[in-house]
């Protein structure tokens, strides 16, 4: 404590600390909107933690454009230039590309080993083993539609977003530690052991196949069916571990008694679902119930469990 206060009382050191603190606050986010020279010759570029590049120009010489110390790089919708090994410094943990970025095939070393978050909107090339660093925890590839081989995606991934993926999933394609997953417009067959037992939250939208028992792992606690699908909900197709359940927005057909597991505490019915509630449809564990916008049926006695404390109409 004495050392700290002796330094703090030194007017020169105090002034220097305040100056650097001001530089950091003023330059922690740098937006490049004219040329890359804005970044190369920025007088306080070393203070930047977030860099947003809004232009379509090459990054330039090997590793010279983006300063070491930056932790987040965002390439917006205009950027569409090659990324080479060493261009992104090893301090970067979060990397995002806009919808116009159509990269070449990546090679080992393209991304730094510090990376934990990668979002590539339009990437649609084959991914080979070790091309993505083993540090990635969140991977979002929105327009990706190339077949994935088992054990290619890093085992470190805990959140995976695969939208528009239309190839048959195989065992071990989805990494074993994934806890949150978005699978949008997947239209191939599901089967047992395709999703890992680590999975807790699943967003499964526009799945146009039947859903059967054991297709989804019993580790799932939050299940959202998005816009549409499955074609039918077979008996026990929703895992008995699910606590938060949202049926697909476009679902209109009658939900049979027994389809909602006893574990569900938070239930959202589809906007256009307008069937009378049958006794026994809603589980006794339910505490929160959200009806769809167009629901206008008379609620009969004993259809809503006494455990429900919140109702949204």
Whereabouts are the PLM-identified features?
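C-terminal capping region of solenoid repeat domains
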Residues: 2-3, 15-17, 189, 198-203, ...
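Concave beta-strand-loop units of leucine-rich repeat
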Residues: 32, 51-58, 74-81, 96-103, ...
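Intrinsic disorder/low-complexity signal
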Residues: 15, 24-25, 36, 71-76, ...
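Residue-identity detector for glycine
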Residues: 1, 6, 43, 56, ...
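Canonical leucine-rich repeat
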Residues: 59-62, 66, 82-83, 88, ...
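LRR N-terminal entry segment and analogous cap-like coil->beta motifs
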Residues: 5-83, 91-101
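Leucine-rich repeat
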Residues: 44-49, 66-72, 88-94, 111-117, ...
């Amino acid at each position: 404590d004495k050392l700290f206060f002796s330094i703090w009382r030194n007017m020169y050191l105090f002034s220097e600390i305040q100056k650097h603190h001001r530089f950091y606050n003023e330059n922690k986010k740098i937006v490049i909107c004219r040329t890359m020279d804005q970044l190369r010759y920025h007088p306080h570029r070393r203070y930047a933690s977030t860099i947003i590049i809004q232009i379509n120009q090459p990054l330039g010489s090997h590793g010279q454009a983006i300063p070491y110390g930056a932790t987040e790089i965002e390439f917006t919708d205009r950027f569409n230039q090659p990324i080479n090994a060493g261009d992104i410094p090893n301090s970067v943990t979060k990397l995002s590309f806009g919808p116009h970025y159509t990269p070449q095939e990546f090679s080992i070393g393209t991304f730094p080993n510090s990376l934990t978050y990668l979002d590539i909107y339009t990437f649609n090339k084959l991914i080979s083993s070790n091309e993505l660093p083993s540090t990635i925890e969140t991977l979002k590839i929105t327009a990706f539609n190339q077949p994935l081989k088992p054990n290619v995606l890093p085992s470190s991934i805990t959140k995976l977003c695969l939208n528009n993926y239309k190839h048959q999933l195989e065992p071990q394609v989805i990494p074993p530690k994934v806890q949150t997953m978005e699978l949008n417009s997947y239209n191939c067959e599901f089967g047992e052991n395709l999703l890992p037992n680590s999975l807790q939250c699943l967003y499964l939208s526009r799945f146009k196949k039947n859903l059967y028992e054991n297709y989804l792992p019993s580790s799932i606690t939050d299940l959202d069916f998005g816009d549409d699908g499955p074609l039918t909900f077979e008996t026990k197709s929703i895992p008995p571990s699910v606590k938060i359940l949202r049926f697909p927005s476009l679902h209109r057909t009658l939900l049979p008694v027994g389809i909602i597991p006893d574990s569900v505490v938070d239930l959202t019915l589809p906007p256009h679902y307008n069937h009378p509630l049958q006794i026994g449809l809603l589980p006794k564990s339910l505490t929160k119930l959200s009806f769809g916008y167009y629901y206008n049926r008379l609620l009969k006695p004993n259809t809503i469990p006494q455990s429900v404390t919140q109702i949204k109409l």
